[in-house]
UniProtKB/Swiss-Prot annotation:
Main location: membrane
Organism the protein comes from: Saccharomyces cerevisiae (strain ATCC 204508 / S288c)
Topology in membrane: Multi-pass membrane protein
Compartment(s): Membrane
UniProtKB keywords: Membrane, Transmembrane, Transmembrane helix
GO CC, alphabetical: membrane
Family listed: Belongs to the UPF0479 family.
Name of the protein in its database record: Putative UPF0479 protein YBL113W-A
Transmembrane segments: 39-59, 136-156
Note: Completely overlaps YBL113C.
């Protein structure tokens, strides 16, 4: 079991990371419920691509999580591939696993937690399961998704 002081340190790190532009943990019991198994960081595709300084956040977290590695399996979901490739050595050195739930379906290994919800409907997964709130309102994510779908359709119709 992880020492209480280390738990507190990790919680402070998470709160500090939230100020760097990633998620804010609302539920202080998060570590109590997950400390025997894993900590999961969810970076939905659109916020990670447009709003979150992913590299800065991960470097900040990795500095702290080297000492936590024996106690946690740290997983990142939905990290855009370009960030994962650039940060592969950093992630490996801290035993951080990277899972992209969109590409994982190709080999049939969909993460069990994510499979509880439809993988395209990100809002209930991120908002309810982990009680995480993002600084970017969810409505903006919907606007971006609609915009990109419209863009793809319009490009397709132009070529046909």
């Amino acid at each position: 079991m992880m020492p209480a002081k280390l738990q507190l340190d990790v919680l402070r790190t998470l709160q500090s990371s939230a100020r760097h532009g990633t998620q804010t943990l609302k539920n202080s019991n998060f570590l109590e419920r997950f400390h025997k198994d894993r900590i999961v960081f969810c970076l939905p595709f659109f916020p990670a691509l447009f709003f979150v300084p992913v590299q800065k956040v991960l470097q900040h977290l990795c500095l702290r999580f080297t000492q936590v590695a024996p106690y946690f399996i740290i997983q990142l979901f939905d990290l855009p591939s370009r960030h994962a490739e650039n940060l592969a050595p950093l992630l490996a050195s801290c035993r951080i696993q990277y899972t992209n739930c969109f590409s994982s379906s190709s080999n049939g290994q969909v993460p069990s937690i994510i499979s509880l919800y439809l993988r395209v409907d990100l809002s209930p997964f991120y908002a309810k399961i982990f009680q995480i709130s993002y600084r970017v309102p969810m409505i903006w994510l919907d606007v971006f998704q609609v915009f990109f779908v419209f863009l793809i359709i319009s490009q397709h119709s132009l070529h046909s």
